């Protein structure tokens, strides 16, 4: 049986796309995924261009594949994702042994691109933006476990000054309302209990409803997803503060299937820096969203994205960011030093902050977040948490593991319960009393109801 190896860089959208690449090649050519690159007949790199030196990292990986290609001439090497969108045919110019180059919106054409390459002997490049077409050509998702991702929209129209996403993934395009619901319903029938709705700006969703001119917003979509039998938990990422409507806030007061955790990127806490970033909201507006959410759910946990060292960031600006992190008490974050991306407005901004200062700021921020994480984890000891059981624990397969609503991994034993009994719990929501907190997980005991 032929095999495909996919290496994924970047966000959850890329993870979702990588799964779809495997699904497409499995449905069309019977390929199965492998974790061993040397066993593969097709090697794909699903790339990300958000961080610094992304292109060079890709070419470095490709360089290592050249020797493998020499040994296996029929090996197919492909580059997809956002670096592919940016670089296009220049990838083949620099690495002529690459067979196919495709963008995020053309991954469904992968079988045709590979067939054309094998037929003509010419490398194939397709980095077009055919709207939402790819979803019409993807095979049904293959379910692995009780949780699944569902992409509901693509692209971004916000054009933040530092970000390449609108240029590499195109502008915002939403999937039709019924298509999303049908996919979620199909997943639920296969045993999925938790869905994560995905989009670059997921709460900018505006899906066409049937043959009418009516448009469903994100809040309405969630309401309908919550009514699908079998779905017990709903997550989403990544949301944008500018699109966080009052309807969406109010939904947290009446939809208990929305988890008690939200990832809402703020990027910074200085209005001057936010304006330079072209984020489209103020610090006060962002805090207002958090305040209204916590009025409905006082113990709601928050995570965020932060950029330190943006051009012009002063010590005072950074102190504002640290103060907000303390005030909101973020539970985990994705934090980075600003890296200028070619072709973005921010790449042309004057930046005189030394690299060492930026690094010190990042380390200070991450240390504070880590303290928050440990404090929150310790605070969960002695509480009873609702856990979605995902399967055997990684370190001890005789135990089970699951996740809390705020994404903590919880391991727990079931003394005296046979394997069949443990297997039946996978995909179920159970109550677990938390007994210990570790740096990256929790431990607990299942609560048996009399």
Curated annotation (Swiss-Prot):
Q: Which NCBIfam families match?
A: miaB-methiolase (TIGR01574), MiaB/RimO family radical SAM methylthiotransferase (TIGR00089)
Compartments, as annotated in UniProt: Cytoplasm
The reaction(s) annotated as catalysed by this protein in its Swiss-Prot or TrEMBL entry are: N(6)-dimethylallyladenosine(37) in tRNA + (sulfur carrier)-SH + AH2 + 2 S-adenosyl-L-methionine = 2-methylsulfanyl-N(6)-dimethylallyladenosine(37) in tRNA + (sulfur carrier)-H + 5'-deoxyadenosine + L-methionine + A + S-adenosyl-L-homocysteine + 2 H(+)
InterPro entries according to UniProt: Elp3/MiaA/NifB-like_rSAM, Methylthiotransferase, Methylthiotransferase_CS, Methylthiotransferase_N, Methylthiotransferase_N_sf, MiaB_methiolase, rSAM, rSAM_horseshoe
Q: Which PROSITE patterns match?
A: MTTASE_N, MTTASE_RADICAL, RADICAL_SAM, TRAM
Q: What class of enzyme is it?
A: transferase
Q: Does the keyword NAD apply?
A: no
Protein name stated in the entry: tRNA-2-methylthio-N(6)-dimethylallyladenosine synthase
Q: What does this protein do?
A: Catalyzes the methylthiolation of N6-(dimethylallyl)adenosine (i(6)A), leading to the formation of 2-methylthio-N6-(dimethylallyl)adenosine (ms(2)i(6)A) at position 37 in tRNAs that read codons beginning with uridine.
Similarity-based family: Belongs to the methylthiotransferase family. MiaB subfamily.
Q: Primary place of residence?
A: cytoplasm
- Co-factor note (free text): Binds 2 [4Fe-4S] clusters. One cluster is coordinated with 3 cysteines and an exchangeable S-adenosyl-L-methionine.
Kindly give the SUPFAM superfamilies that the UniProt entry links to this protein.
Radical SAM enzymes
Q: Which GO terms describe its cellular component?
A: cytosol
User: SMART domains, per this entry?
Assistant: Elp3 (SM00729)
Instruction: Please state every residue range assigned to the domain named TRAM.
Output: 378-448
Instruction: State the needed cofactors, names only.
Output: [4Fe-4S] cluster
**HAMAP family cross-referenced by the UniProt entry:** tRNA_metthiotr_MiaB (MF_01864)
Ranges of residues in domain Radical SAM core: 142-375
Key words, A-Z: 4Fe-4S, Cytoplasm, Iron, Iron-sulfur, Metal-binding, S-adenosyl-L-methionine, Transferase, tRNA processing
